[in-house]
């Protein structure tokens, strides 16, 4: 499985190199800057039985990953419906621009 997100500064191409430096006996993994999640996804494949903690300061991104983890089937169904309601490139682009504007308007940094 690859990350469903393209993320600036992502680690997807660096994962093989990073994994060369992992210690032999890993008992947990913590990812403070989740982003596109490439390294965390790789760790779940390599070490399916260890606890994995992830975090990201950018709330929309963090909430996306929570939704994918906790309710992936529902998220998938919603995305399919969006695609059906916006079948052409122009409509899909406008949906993207509207969503981008909404995200940029709100202060969505996670501050608890």
Locations of regions flagged by a protein language model:
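Broad hydrophobic/π-residue packing in well-ordered secondary structure
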Residues: 7, 29-33, 40-41, 65, ...
């Amino acid at each position: 499985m690859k990350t469903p997100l393209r993320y600036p500064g992502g680690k997807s191409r660096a994962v093989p190199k990073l994994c060369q430096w992992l210690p032999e006996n890993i008992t947990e993994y913590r990812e403070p800057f989740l982003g596109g999640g490439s390294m965390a996804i790789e760790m779940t494949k390599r070490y399916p039985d260890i606890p994995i903690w992830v975090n990201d300061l950018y709330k929309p991104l963090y909430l996306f990953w929570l939704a994918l983890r906790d309710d992936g089937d529902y998220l998938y169904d919603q995305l399919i419906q969006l695609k059906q309601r916006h079948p052409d490139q122009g409509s899909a682009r406008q949906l993207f621009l509207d969503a981008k504007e909404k995200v940029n308007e709100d202060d969505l940094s996670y501050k608890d």
